[in-house]
Swiss-Prot record:
NCBIfam families per UniProt: PRK00162.1
Subcellular location: Cytoplasm
InterPro entries cross-referenced by the UniProt entry: GlpE_sulfurtransferase, Rhodanese-like_dom, Rhodanese-like_dom_sf, Thiosulf_sulfurTrfase
Limits of the Rhodanese domain: 17-105
GO molecular function, a single term: thiosulfate-cyanide sulfurtransferase activity
Name of the featured protein: Thiosulfate sulfurtransferase GlpE
Reaction it catalyzes: thiosulfate + hydrogen cyanide = thiocyanate + sulfite + 2 H(+); thiosulfate + [thioredoxin]-dithiol = [thioredoxin]-disulfide + hydrogen sulfide + sulfite + 2 H(+)
Source organism: Escherichia coli O157:H7
Biological process per Gene Ontology, one example term: glycerol metabolic process
GO CC list: cytoplasm
Main localization, broad class: cytoplasm
Gene3D superfamilies listed in its UniProt record: Rhodanese-like domain (3.40.250.10)
Length: 108
């Protein structure tokens, strides 16, 4: 895959339920602590190395941000690092929280 794909929150949720992909959240620490998808890994410059050590390049990665814009750059970056399949989640955390309020965790 040379280009990331966009995915809606319903499809992203299904991929998580079926363990077909991992979810990363690239928002700032304060926003992440105020609420994030239950299964999200908080991906930052400081946690990138750990994420890459723990997730093979053939593991599909879904990137979540605030509204679905910043995630596109991060998705492209992960492709450039060697990940085979990367998705940017349309609508970001705001859409996730609206559609799946019961699947939001709080705290870091």
């Amino acid at each position: 895959m040379d280009q990331f794909e966009c995915i809606n929150v319903a499809d992203a949720h299904q991929k998580l339920q079926e363990k077909e992909a991992v979810l990363v959240d690239i928002r700032d620490p304060q926003s992440f602590a105020m609420g994030h998808a239950v299964q999200a890994f908080h991906l930052t410059n400081d946690t990138l190395g750990a994420f890459m050590r723990n997730n093979d390049f053939d593991t599909p990665v879904m990137v979540m941000c605030y509204h679905g814009n910043s995630s596109k750059g991060a998705a492209q970056y992960l492709l450039q690092q060697g990940y085979d399949v990367v998705y940017s989640i349309d609508g970001g955390f705001e859409a996730w929280q609206r559609q799946f309020p019961a699947e939001v965790a709080y705290g870091a």
